[in-house]
UniProtKB/Swiss-Prot annotation:
GO molecular function, one term: cellulase activity
GO biological process, one term: cellulose catabolic process
GO cellular component: extracellular region
High-level lineage: Eukaryota, Fungi, Dikarya, Basidiomycota, Ustilaginomycotina
Superkingdom: Eukaryota
Species of provenance: Mycosarcoma maydis (Corn smut fungus)
UniProt keyword annotation of Nucleotide-binding present: no
Entry protein name: Endoglucanase 1
Length: 393
């Protein structure tokens, strides 16, 4: 009897494991917004014409990475942050299509940084239909603790995740006002507590998107549209070999030619020309916090456990003074400090890509001395996680 029982339990266990694996293959889109410098913002990570933009604490003013190569992510106590312009936005021709940025865990970072992918979604995690169930996104971060084939979407108010000190440092808005560490705010009304430039993008989730939507198959790489490059400033050198998205889109969202000259006025106009909207210079008003980098309100560090949709973190151990205790609930997740820094253990010098441009150094190693920014919070080096974000709610 005991033998039969053990066999039965083994069969049940294997069955549940297969269900889990099927779920991973299907994938989901988790979400986050931690204000950290993107992993793809570092020089030498991938064969690109220019890395992803880095901004000052106002979320608008650009920092030239070549003139300030040693500057650190705001999540590590530095002066470089995510630019507010890099929020989700809609296509005006196709009412079911949206655009945005995030972390994707497939392949090597040198192959995915600044690449664009097209994804479709079945429904959200609650089984609800989504208004925008198609997405073209640009990869700006790695996701070391995001399960394979999952996508971590940048949405303001989507959860500070493993690096909860970045947004309070950038905006002076305490961590508790950003919602749950994993999952973020729970209603569009709570978005009004966020900095003014981020409120529209926060509300977008509730009107257009959903909660951890389930992927319909695997995302497929497409040639990046002009609108994403306009906002990120990054275009891959191999992008001209990729086919564009075949659906109908408005003119601003058509595929970019090689060596596309970005139009940053989109960001300066708030993400939409002629309109004061998400991510622009219209940062006045309640809760915007200005450029206060005081790091107020570092609460909730490690207060929540690992959410659904994330695996074991890879890359560096986030044990530095800036974020050391902030990741106990989420695991570490970046491995982004260069081997050339005092504590890095990876190779500091980028290797050469097939076209002669620099790509990321080999992965591996950790930096227990300096905090490693979630979204690529420190310099190129051991590739690993970025930060992750949110659970179902």
């Amino acid at each position: 009897m005991a033998f039969k029982l053990n066999i039965g339990l083994l069969a049940l266990s294997l069955s549940l494991s297969l269900v889990h694996l099927d779920g991973v293959r299907a994938g989901m889109a988790t979400r986050y917004w931690d204000c950290c410098l993107a992993s793809a913002s570092w020089e030498g990570k991938a064969p690109v014409y220019a890395p992803v933009d880095a901004c000052k604490a106002d979320g608008v003013t650009l920092i030239d990475s070549k003139k300030d190569p040693s500057g650190q992510s705001g999540c590590n106590g530095g002066n470089k942050f995510m630019c507010s312009c890099m929020q989700p936005f809609d296509d005006e021709t196709d009412p079911t299509l949206a655009f945005g940025f995030g972390a994707f865990t497939t392949g090597q970072e040198s192959d995915t940084d600044c690449a664009c992918f097209y994804a479709e979604f079945e429904h959200d995690a609650q089984g609800k239909a989504m208004k925008r169930n198609k997405l073209i996104f640009q990869v700006t971060n790695v996701g070391g603790d995001v399960q394979s084939q999952n996508f971590d979407f940048q949405i303001p108010g989507g959860g500070l995740g493993a690096f909860p000190k970045g947004c309070p440092a950038q905006w002076g808005v305490e961590a508790s006002l950003w919602g749950d560490q994993y999952g973020g705010v729970k209603s569009a009304t709570e978005c009004s507590k966020l900095p003014k430039p981020l409120q529209e993008g926060c509300k977008w989730r509730f009107s257009e998107w959903g909660d951890n939507p389930v992927l319909k198959g695997s995302p497929k790489r497409v040639k990046c549209p002009k609108s994403l490059i306009d906002r990120s400033g990054c275009q891959r050198k191999d992008d001209n070999t990729i086919s564009p998205y075949s659906g109908k889109v408005d003119s601003a969202n058509t595929a970019a030619p090689a060596q596309y000259k970005r139009d940053r006025s989109v960001c300066l106009a708030g993400g939409k020309k002629g309109k004061s909207a998400a991510g622009g210079v219209d940062g006045s008003g309640d809760a915007s916090g200005g450029a206060d980098a005081s790091g107020a309100g570092g609460a909730a560090e490690g207060s929540q456990g690992q959410p659904e949709g994330y695996g074991q973190p890879s890359g560096g151990n986030d044990q530095g003074s800036s974020n050391g205790d902030a990741t106990t609930g989420a695991g570490s997740g970046s491995g982004s400090d260069s081997g050339s820094t005092a504590n890095g253990s990876g190779s500091g010098a980028p290797t050469s890509g097939s076209d002669g441009s620099a790509v990321a150094p080999p992965s591996g190693g950790s930096n227990p001395g300096a905090a490693q920014g979630g979204q690529g919070g420190a310099q190129p080096g051991p590739s690993g996680g970025h930060k992750k974000c949110h659970k179902k709610h």
